[in-house]
Regions:
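Non-catalytic, mostly N-terminal accessory regions of nucleic-acid modification and defense proteins
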Residues: 1-136, 200-203, 209, 315-318, ...
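Conserved S-adenosyl-L-methionine
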Residues: 116-233, 238-240, 247-255, 267, ...
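Short small-residue beta-strand/loop micro-motif enriched in glycine and branched aliphatics
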Residues: 107-110, 171-173, 352-353
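A conserved structural/catalytic subdomain of Rossmann-like adenosyl-cofactor enzymes
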Residues: 212, 216-218, 222-448
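Generic hydrophobic, helix-prone segments enriched in Leu/Val/Ile
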Residues: 34-37, 176, 198, 258, ...
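Short helix/loop capping segments that flank catalytic or ligand/cofactor-binding pockets
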Residues: 89, 162, 186, 353, ...
Length: 448
């Protein structure tokens, strides 16, 4: 049975049983819930989901000072959830969407901490829209199937699920993610399950991306190394790291050099890019500094450009994230790309202002994706820039160098302007003479 449905849960641990215990204020609810968590981790999913509920502490004094108080609190909370769920459909799409909504609401309320685990859905939609288009001929539309998609800083998994939503439930062979934070790692696994993704269809690894702790990614045989059709990521911005000397010879970095200790942005980028297939697409969110900073970052950026790997640079509005108000960019990379230019999209002015965060509306997202797909040129919005021009700019990718949003001032005709001033002065003289005539009739002082 497990082979067919992938997991088995005993009747006592089903939601309906737990909810009934809560309604009847059953004194064994807490014990049953803990036993259910242990069963799911150790037996229901075998070793695949070991530690899934490790961050849930049912003995926390926040629930109550003793067992009875904690049990009563759990009864109240679970009954309220059960009563609420009765009003909605219980299919996996609804449950998954509800879970995603709660993650989003938690992110909105947790401020800067949200950047550790959540990518706003509007931005996820842009990245997923890009990587699901045909890599060599985006204008031909979306791919029918992706063998694999990879997010090496997956947080709660929302970005990976956005790609899956775009491709459909059977459009991706394998969803692969990696997350360093244990709590967020568990959130991602739960998120997959609640969206109906089978345990055989995804793999989330808990470990450090930069040190490459995942054994399957450390395979030295190129023929056996994993490669992905699509790579998406929203890594921590300008993360401080301590690269060892040995990392300089790491297969991910040795052709480009190490990112500076003060900002691991390019280290994250090179990690994902290394595992991209030859015909794959990578879309990564980064701070604007990667476009123009000097030193080691300039050397990495220059080599990526000279090798023809940077396909598109997209500038987004400021204050889109819960964790930071700075504007960010999306870099689209390919190992084999047809155009010998770089597409720049300056979407910084296209947003709806909100009280706490700015928002991208569907039309803003569609405009970005349509411009990328058809490589359109538009005044003050997008431009295809040749490598010769980029070389002249010192391989600086600052978007405003190529696509300025400033409106061109209209040319002033000096002769015409002079004539207008003469006409105005003559009109003033005529009006004053007429006014003085009235004043004279009234016996009043005239205007000088």
């Amino acid at each position: 049975m497990r082979r067919k449905v992938h997991y088995v849960i005993q009747p006592a641990y089903l939601w309906s049983s737990i909810a009934e215990m809560a309604r009847t204020q059953n004194g064994e609810l807490l014990h049953t819930l803990q036993n259910g968590f242990d069963y799911i981790e150790n037996e229901s999913f075998a070793s695949t989901f070991d530690g899934l509920f490790s961050e849930i502490n049912l003995n926390s004094e926040k629930l109550g000072k003793d067992y009875t108080a904690r049990n009563a609190t759990l009864c109240t909370v679970i009954k309220a959830i059960a009563d609420g769920l009765e009003k909605f459909s219980t299919d996996k799409d609804t449950l998954g969407d509800a879970y995603e909504y709660l993650i989003g609401q938690f992110a909105a309320g947790s401020g800067k901490k949200a950047g550790e685990f959540y990518t706003p859905q509007q931005i996820s939609s842009i990245l997923s829209g890009i990587v699901t288009l045909d890599s060599q001929e985006p204008a031909t539309g979306q791919k029918k199937h992706l063998e694999s998609v990879f997010d090496f800083a997956c947080g709660s998994g929302s970005l990976l699920l956005n790609v899956r939503h775009r491709m459909g439930p059977h459009g991706i062979g394998k969803i692969v993610g990696q997350e360093k934070n244990i709590t967020t790692y568990n959130l991602a696994r739960m998120n997959m399950l609640l969206h109906g993704v089978k345990d055989s269809e995804f793999e989330i690894y808990h470990g450090d991306t930069l040190t490459n702790e995942w054994d399957s990614l450390r395979e030295m045989n190129p023929a056996k190394q994993p490669r992905f059709d699509a790579v998406v990521a929203n890594p921590p911005f300008s993360y401080r790291w301590e690269p060892s000397e040995a990392l300089g010879d790491d297969m991910r970095f040795k052709n480009y050099g190490l990112a500076p200790k003060s900002a691991a942005d390019f280290a994250f980028l090179l990690h994902g890019f290394h595992f991209l297939k030859q015909d794959g697409v990578m879309a990564i969110i980064l701070p604007h500094g990667v476009l123009f900073r000097g030193g080691a970052e300039e050397r990495i950026r220059t080599k990526l450009l000279k090798d023809g790997h940077i396909d598109t640079v997209i500038g987004l509005p400021a204050n889109l994230f819960f964790s930071t108000g700075i504007p960010v960019c999306i870099l689209v990379l390919k190992k084999c790309k047809k155009p010998d230019d770089v597409l720049f999209i300056n979407a910084a002015q296209y947003f709806e202002k909100g009280k706490r965060q700015n928002r991208l509306l569907p039309e803003h997202i569609d405009k970005i994706l349509d411009t990328y797909q058809h490589r359109r040129k538009e005044d003050r919005y997008s431009m295809r820039v040749s490598m010769e021009r980029i070389e002249k700019e010192g391989y600086n990718l600052n978007i405003s160098r190529y696509v300025s949003t400033a409106e061109v001032e209209a040319a002033i005709d000096l002769a015409d302007t002079h004539q207008q001033l003469v006409d105005i002065e003559q009109a003033i003289v005529r009006s004053k003479d007429k006014h003085n005539a009235f004043l004279k009739e009234l016996g009043l002082s005239l205007l000088p």
